[in-house]
UniProtKB/Swiss-Prot annotation:
SMART domains: HLH (SM00353). One of its GO terms (biological process) is intracellular iron ion homeostasis. This is Transcription factor bHLH115. It comes from Arabidopsis thaliana (Mouse-ear cress). Keywords: DNA-binding, Nucleus, Transcription, Transcription regulation. Homodimer. Interacts with BTS and BHLH47/PYE. It is found in: Nucleus. One of its GO terms (molecular function) is DNA binding. GO terms for cellular component: nucleus. It holds the Pfam family HLH. The keyword Nucleus applies. Residues 66-117 form the bHLH domain. PANTHER family: BHLH TRANSCRIPTION FACTOR, TRANSCRIPTION FACTOR BHLH115. It comes from the Eukaryota.
Length: 226
C-alpha cells in the first residue's frame, strides 16, 4: 500500500535506479515519480468522482421517483375514497340493488332524487299553509258560535223570567155571559127589536147572592123613615 504522504516513493530506492541504468545504458530511463504518481492518483481520483457521480445521479433519480410514487399513491387513495363515496351514494339511492359504477348515472339519480324531494317539500309546505288557514277559519267560526250560544242563553233566561212573572200575577175571575141562543129565544117573535150580535167576553160584575137580594126582613133591619 502506498501512503498518500509520500507520492515520490520510487526515488527512495537508488539501487533499482542504478540497475536499470547499467543494464540499458543506451536507453535513458528517467523516473519522474511525482508526475507518474500524480497522474495515477489524479486518475484514481477522477475515476472515483466518475464512480460517485452515477451513484449520486441514481440516488437523485430514485428520490424523485419516490416522491412521484408517493404523489401517485395519494392520488390513488383519493380516487379510491371518491369511488367509495359514489358506491355509498348509489346504495343509498337504490337500496337492495347492486351499486352502480357509472358516476354520471349516479349523479343524475342523485339530482333527480333531490328535485323530487324538493317538490314534495314544497307541496307539503303549501298543504301546511292551507291547513293553517282552515284552522284559523274554524277558530273564528267557533268563536262566533260561542257568542251566538251565549246570546241564546241570555234570551232564554229572559223569556223564563217573563213566564215566571206572568204565572205569579193574579188571574181575574171568569164572568158569566148568557148564551146568544137563549137571548134570541127570550125575545118575542113579533117584536120589532133587532137582535144584537154578541161581543167577545169581557170582565163584568158578578151576580149578588140570594141572601143579599132577600127583602123580607127589610122592615126589621131597616125601619121606614118617618
Amino acid at each position: 500500500m502506498v501512503s498518500p504522504e509520500n507520492t515520490n516513493w520510487l526515488s527512495d530506492y537508488p539501487l533499482i535506479e542504478g540497475a536499470f541504468s547499467d543494464q540499458n545504458p543506451t536507453f535513458p530511463w528517467q523516473i519522474d515519480g511525482s508526475a507518474t504518481v500524480s497522474v495515477e492518483v489524479d486518475g484514481f481520483l477522477c475515476d472515483a468522482d466518475v464512480i460517485k457521480e452515477p451513484s449520486s445521479r441514481k440516488r437523485i433519480k430514485t428520490e424523485s421517483c419516490t416522491g412521484s410514487n408517493s404523489k401517485a399513491c395519494r392520488e390513488k387513495q383519493r380516487r379510491d375514497r371518491l369511488n367509495d363515496k359514489f358506491t355509498e351514494l348509489s346504495s343509498v339511492l337504490e337500496p337492495g340493488r347492486t351499486p352502480k359504477t357509472d358516476k354520471v348515472a349516479i349523479i343524475n339519480d342523485a339530482i333527480r332524487m333531490v328535485n323530487q324531494a324538493r317538490d314534495e317539500a314544497q307541496k307539503l309546505k303549501d298543504l301546511n299553509s292551507s291547513l293553517q288557514e282552515k284552522i284559523k277559519e274554524l277558530k273564528d267560526e267557533k268563536n262566533e258560535l260561542r257568542d251566538e250560544k251565549q246570546k241564546l242563553k241570555v234570551e232564554k233566561e229572559r223569556i223564563d223570567q217573563q213566564l215566571k212573572a206572568i204565572k205569579t200575577q193574579p188571574q181575574p175571575q171568569p164572568c158569566f155571559l148568557p148564551n146568544p141562543q137563549t137571548l134570541s129565544q127570550a125575545q118575542a117573535p113579533g117584536s120589532k127589536l133587532v137582535p144584537f150580535t154578541t161581543y167577545p167576553g169581557f170582565a163584568m160584575w158578578q151576580f149578588m147572592p140570594p141572601a143579599a137580594v132577600d127583602t123580607s126582613q127589610d122592615h126589621v133591619l131597616r125601619p121606614p123613615v118617618a
